[in-house]
């Protein structure tokens, strides 16, 4: 059973009527983060410009009170990420939370990976959201179908890759770090799965950090635990 914590304000910052970034920690949902901030800073309204999965970290762009009306535009901004992908394995959730569903011993070579990523720059990409996601089909969230072992047709979604670059690749562990600059609605988990398949292999997302949303950058964001202190 997960330990429940209380929080206290760490600062006397005024976060009312503001747009600001929070460095979301791992194992917190995006909604958990903003609801904690809302409660302990006495805010009337709060929202964010794009969900990060609980396992992801990085820039959660937040708007409060009167500024929440700007979220509809902020959500449309391009986003930049650093993703760590593990090849040779496929999982049910396309990330480290799921069960391993496929495995191969085939090795990916750095040159092949570089060529594939270069090919994907400035291209439209058709992807299916992960079955374990909050996307709604016929009024029901995809993860609800998955948990009930119910099959459902998941439509492909047209998204855009502005730029994708190889940061590093380890040929022994078959792990890679890539940077991605993508349009709204882009699922990095689906990308990890798809890039594995495109390379005649498998892949899943090990770690993800969002570093930019439009003109807002992670290095300008508040650390979550600088805003609130966790107490038993």
Curated annotation (Swiss-Prot):
Protein species of origin: Malacoplasma penetrans (strain HF-2) (Mycoplasma penetrans)
Keyword DNA damage set for record: no
One GO BP annotation of this record: tRNA pseudouridine synthesis
Residues the record marks as active site: 53
Pfam families documented for this protein: TruB_N
Role this protein plays: Responsible for synthesis of pseudouridine from uracil-55 in the psi GC loop of transfer RNAs.
GO MF entry, a single one: tRNA pseudouridine(55) synthase activity
Family, as annotated: Belongs to the pseudouridine synthase TruB family. Type 1 subfamily.
UniProt xrefs under HAMAP family: TruB_bact (MF_01080)
This protein's name: tRNA pseudouridine synthase B
Source organism phylogeny: Bacteria, Bacillati, Mycoplasmatota, Mycoplasmoidales, Mycoplasmoidaceae
EC number(s) stated in the UniProt entry for this protein: 5.4.99.25
Keyword Ubl conjugation in record: no
Gene: truB
Keywords on record: Isomerase, tRNA processing
The reaction(s) this protein catalyses: uridine(55) in tRNA = pseudouridine(55) in tRNA
């Amino acid at each position: 059973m997960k330990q429940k914590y209380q929080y206290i304000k760490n600062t006397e910052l005024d976060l009312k009527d503001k747009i600001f970034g929070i460095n979301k920690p791992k194992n917190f949902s995006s909604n958990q983060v903003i609801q904690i901030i809302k409660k302990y800073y006495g805010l009337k309204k709060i929202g964010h410009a794009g969900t990060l999965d609980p396992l992801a970290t990085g820039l959660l762009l937040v708007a409060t009170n009167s500024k929440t009306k700007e979220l509809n535009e902020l959500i449309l901004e391009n986003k930049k990420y650093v993703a760590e992908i593990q090849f040779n394995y496929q999982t049910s959730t396309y990330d480290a939370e799921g069960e391993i569903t496929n495995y191969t011993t085939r090795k990916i070579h750095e040159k092949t990976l570089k060529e594939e990523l270069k090919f994907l720059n400035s291209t439209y990409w058709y992807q299916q959201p992960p079955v374990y996601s909050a996307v709604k089909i016929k009024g029901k969230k995809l993860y609800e179908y998955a948990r009930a072992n119910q099959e459902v047709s998941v439509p492909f979604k047209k998204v855009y890759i502005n730029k994708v670059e190889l940061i590093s690749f380890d040929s022994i562990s078959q792990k890679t770090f890539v940077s991605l600059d993508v349009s709204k609605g882009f699922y990095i988990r689906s990308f990890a799965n798809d890039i594995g398949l495109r390379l005649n292999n498998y892949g899943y997302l090990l770690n993800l950090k969002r570093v930019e949303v439009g003109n807002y950058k992670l290095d300008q964001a508040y650390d979550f635990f600088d805003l609130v202190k966790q107490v038993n």
